[in-house]
A protein has these predicted regions:
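A metal-dependent hydrolase metal-coordination microenvironment
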Residues: 1-99, 103
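Alpha-helix termination/capping residues and helix-transition junctions
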Residues: 65, 111-114
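Internal active-site segments that recognize and position negatively charged phosphoryl groups
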Residues: 104-108
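Histidine/lysine/aspartate-rich catalytic loop segments that bind and position anionic ligands
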Residues: 114-136
């Protein structure tokens, strides 16, 4: 069968955006697409739940409210910090930052409310851009 999974970011700890409301509306939109293409294309409803461990109650509400076919777990920032994309890595001890990042990833895995883990080396792409180094 031909199929597609439609997912979108939901960085649950976002300060400037109501991701709960967005997730509900996005799920409803995908459900309409599922119905429209039923019998022709398998459409899966998914979500990339970023930083789910930082707002577990909100995350659990989203996952309980919507019957996702696939949930991607990810960490785009450390708790109470900006996304790794925005950091000036010259101001950080990289080893310490990565240790904290992988500890957060470990907590995410222990939480386990997802089907697959996204981009495990996410900060490394931005560290490389700043420092020219790519090492673990």
């Amino acid at each position: 069968a031909v199929g597609i999974a439609i997912t979108d970011h939901c960085d649950i700890d976002g300060k400037d955006f109501d991701y709960y409301d967005f997730a509900l509306k996005q799920y409803a939109a995908v459900e309409k697409v599922k119905a429209e293409f039923s019998g022709r294309i398998d459409v899966l409803a998914g979500i990339e739940l970023g930083q789910g461990i930082y707002e577990r109650e909100k995350s659990d509400l989203i996952l309980q409210k919507n019957n996702y076919d696939i949930v991607i777990g990810s960490i785009h920032n450390l708790e109470n910090m900006e996304d790794f994309y925005f950091l000036d890595y010259r101001k950080y001890d990289i080893k310490s930052l990565l240790t904290d990042y992988f500890n957060a990833e470990y907590e995410l895995v222990k939480w386990g409310r997802f089907d697959t883990l996204a981009h495990l080396t996410y900060p490394l792409r931005y560290i490389f851009e700043t420092t020219g180094e790519f090492q673990l």
